[in-house]
């Protein structure tokens, strides 16, 4: 379990309130297998940012108060403000509500937020997650805004594009922020099929805090951007073994969530 039992969330449980329940309705029995992407293969920033770590600056840590507890990444959108993470990073699931007071620090490392902290809002998860904590729908979207910003988040750090209906076996780059580390963990390996609605990958050193970390295929070695096909989550909230991670399969339900998020930003 990558986040729900972390000391970070326990310490701030008193501030977790029920948010607005933005939901969509999708047929869970009719899974699309047609590959779909959200845009071009490489939504690069307007100017190349410095890359002080092995991770893409489009990946960052989610914070509540002064502690990071999950991982998120920027996904391409016309507005340039959309984040992708695990549903359990922004919503408590069955019987719970949306978390509040979240901020996002893209490119975070060594206690430094090189692009500042961005307020997370407009969180969105599928009804199957909010009603029953369905591990096959452990995917969430949100938007990120910074007071006084003159450029969009995506124009500063770039963005991965979203793909649905992808192959189960693909070479990926996996990135996540362990909650006991100030630098991101990065691993490259090939995914496999856990079941009809779940992916898995073996990558050592992805413990609590890495939930929501993106699974990126076709990473550009210069920009470190590519196409995201999953996030750490799903089965056992991403897995109870830090050396094996899981993701809900990105299908038409995920695409519908993305489209609903971009339609209201």
Where are these regions (language model features)?
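C-terminal cap/linker of serine protease catalytic domains
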Residues: 229, 233-265
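Catalytic Cys-His active-site segments of thiol-dependent hydrolases/isopeptidases
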Residues: 83-87, 106, 174-176, 224-234
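Catalytic nucleophile loop of clan PA
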Residues: 205-231
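Protease-domain processing segments flanking chymotrypsin-fold serine proteases, especially trypsin-like
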Residues: 1-77, 256, 260-265
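Acidic glycine-/aspartate-rich tracts in secreted/extracellular proteins
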Residues: 89-90, 108-111, 146-149, 179, ...
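Chymotrypsin/trypsin-fold serine protease catalytic domain
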Residues: 120-123, 135-209
